[in-house]
Amino acid sequence: MNKEKAIVVFSGGQDSTTCLFWAKKKYKEVIAVSFDYNQKHKLELDCAKDICKKYNIEHHILDLNLLNQLAPNSLTRQDITVDKSAPKEGVPNSFVDGRNLLFLSFVAVFAKQKGINTIITGVSQSDFSGYPDCRDVFIKSLNVTLNLAMDYEFEIITPLMWINKAETWKMAYDLGVLDIVKEETLTCYNGIKADGCGECPACKLRKKGYWEFEKEYLK
């Protein structure tokens, strides 16, 4: 297994950007892969491109517009408003069915062609928003499936799986990229860079995490 190269699933948001710079510390060669699925907050792709260009990281954007056709929801349709809070039952309307399944599957195909075994993704079960494809059991299951499907040894690494948003901010701080993550990323479901709209679930979680990080670690 090649332990010197890694591919990062990169959206241009807080979590994947933190993982990207974490990977840069650990591996000699890092490639970022983003997906264009005609998402409503498409500015995230511009953030991803800008970050990779500014910090000299090889970057590829793969076309996955089919996902938009298959899974209409508040992140892929202009006429569907993002839920401001989690529903009592079921998943939030910001959940894109099959997104992480497809992202990781396509990245695995790409990785094999590049002779790379390590795939890094920023999913987290600790602060997850009710998304089933952010759970550790899903990632481990998919890892086994991809290995069997392609007769190749992949290792999917999830640096944020068991840490909360405050600890994710702390990781960025320890990596020396806190300002980059704070100012140059896009997490907002309404497509607003940095601090975002402040109202969508992603912004609320990000803001709460930063407040807890400041309180706990920047005393």
UniProtKB/Swiss-Prot annotation:
Give the record's keywords alphabetically: ATP-binding, Ligase, Metal-binding, Nucleotide-binding, Queuosine biosynthesis, Zinc
Q: Give its E.C. classification number.
A: 6.3.4.20
- Do you know which Gene3D superfamilies this protein is assigned to? HUPs (3.40.50.620)
Q: Which SUPFAM superfamilies match?
A: Adenine nucleotide alpha hydrolases-like (SSF52402)
The pathway that the record names for this protein is: Purine metabolism; 7-cyano-7-deazaguanine biosynthesis
Query: Which prosthetic group or cofactor does it need?
Result: Zn(2+)
InterPro entries membership: QueC, Rossmann-like_a/b/a_fold
Residue numbers binding Zn(2+): 188, 197, 200, 203
Q: Which reaction does it catalyse?
A: 7-carboxy-7-deazaguanine + NH4(+) + ATP = 7-cyano-7-deazaguanine + ADP + phosphate + H2O + H(+)
Keyword Metal-binding applies: yes
Please verify whether the record's keywords include Lipid biosynthesis: no
Explain how, and how many, cofactor molecules are bound.
Answer: Binds 1 zinc ion per subunit.
GO BP terms: queuosine biosynthetic process
User: Which residues are recorded as binding ATP?
Assistant: 10-20
Q: Which GO molecular function entries does the Swiss-Prot or TrEMBL record give? A: ATP binding; ligase activity, forming carbon-nitrogen bonds; zinc ion binding
Instruction: Give one Pfam family.
Output: QueC
Q: Which HAMAP family match?
A: QueC
Its family remark reads: Belongs to the QueC family.
- Quaternary context: Homodimer.
Q: What role does this protein play?
A: Catalyzes the ATP-dependent conversion of 7-carboxy-7-deazaguanine (CDG) to 7-cyano-7-deazaguanine (preQ(0)).
The name this protein goes by in its record: 7-cyano-7-deazaguanine synthase
Organism of origin is Clostridium botulinum (strain Hall / ATCC 3502 / NCTC 13319 / Type A)
